Amino acid sequence: MRKKKAVSDAIYIASYNPKNRTVPDERLDQIFSDVGRRYGYDDVKAKFEPFPDFKIMWERSYKWAEFRVSDYLDRAPDGVLIQLAESVFERISGKQQDYGEALFRYFEDVRDQNTPDYLQRKRLNPESIGRYHDLNDCVNRLREQGLIPPDLECILCWDASSSRKVSQCSVIQRVLTVNSRLDMQGVPEYVLDYAVYNKIAHLMSGYGRRSADAEATRLDALYPMRIEALSWISDHGMTL
């Protein structure tokens, strides 16, 4: 039986406008140049880019480096950007450097502001109800099993892209997507629930720290029908 639509979730309209920036490219470039000199780089360039996800890309040689920084940071205070630049240059130097707490606090403070842009760039509609399944039902079953806390919050979406992954998430934006190929009749509940739980494990583990992946793996192993779900996923040509 086809799942009926209930009252839909809010639909976000992207509000990003580069004129709203409080940090121009010139200031970002200056911060990265100043930090870079402390690490032996005398020619450093940096600018913001509208990446769908938070990320930093760079090219470098002996004395020069060029950075493209997610524009989700184009309203960040100098302290956050300086700490970010220091962490990146530490990583370039070969050290296993975690991003600083200031960056994580900033993302938490501006999460709601960045959500419309994130959803638009990823081409996502923040609605949990699909044709046959409601992702909120998965969350409720996981709560009933005691696998996730009752106060955990995230945005649930169906992903209509061509990805073979059963689910994906942005830990920073707390957005969890499930492949629309699972929104079909006959898909076992334990598979749907595992697709959601596997990514909720990452949301519960946090971000930016090397220990986060290990904690997500530990939580993932607690799912009662994990082996059966993985077998079904593999048999249907999909991956985690």
Language model features: what each stretch is:
Residues 199:
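Walker B catalytic acidic pair
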Residues 196:
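A conserved beta-strand element that flanks and buttresses the S-adenosyl-L-methionine
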Residues 1-193, 203-240:
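Active-site-proximal or metal-binding-adjacent scaffold patches in catalytic folds
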